[in-house]
Amino acid sequence: MRIGIISDTHGSLDPRAYAALADCDHIIHAGDIGGPSVLRELETLAPVTAVLGNNDFDEYGSAAGHFAHPVLEGVRFLVGHKPGDVRVSFAGSAALAPGDPLPDVIIHGHTHVPELKTGPDARPAGLYLCPGAVYRPRSDFGRTIAKMDVEDGHIRHTWVENLDGKVLMEA
């Protein structure tokens, strides 16, 4: 299964981002969606899991909450908008209820800067990811999305690419 990961569209889904996500079986939007029309457009490609960002309000109904915990192909995700929202420590997390299993993948948006960590830097998850931003990027990478291939409970490949399709980081 290929998962497309996008964030910070702020109401403007770049046609190149839409085209880049066309090969995905599921799409995760990590907040600052900017309007229900963005989700409707993404849903023409694949099922969408979305969370609210600090610029999103109640117009999404049940389509987006503050956190999402999808399990896709046996891989557990924790999705929130701000990096601090998805921080998990021994003291717990606002994003996880007591007794919830730890995620395999933590995803956030908000910073507009792509980030991909594995190993000890990603703890307690195996992978920590920010896809960057489709609107107003704050890095020299430009506008970015991420993709992940998962199968039978395993993350096979993860990468961040710019909207020209150039792979910028991978694990």
Give residue ranges: language-model regions.
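N-terminal active-site segment of His-dependent metallophosphoesterases
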Residues: 1-48, 60-67, 74, 141-144, ...
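Divalent metal-coordination and catalytic microenvironments
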Residues: 8, 27, 32, 42, ...
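Short, glycine/acidic-enriched loop or turn micro-motifs at the edges of active sites
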Residues: 11, 35, 56, 84, ...
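Flexible, charged surface loops at secondary-structure boundaries
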Residues: 19-23, 71, 99-102, 123
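Conserved beta-sheet core of the metallophosphoesterase superfamily
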Residues: 49, 83-154, 158
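Glycine/small-residue-rich loop that forms an oxyanion/phosphate-binding "nest" at active or ligand-binding sites
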Residues: 52-58, 62-102
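Short, solvent-exposed aromatic-acidic interface loops
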Residues: 158-170
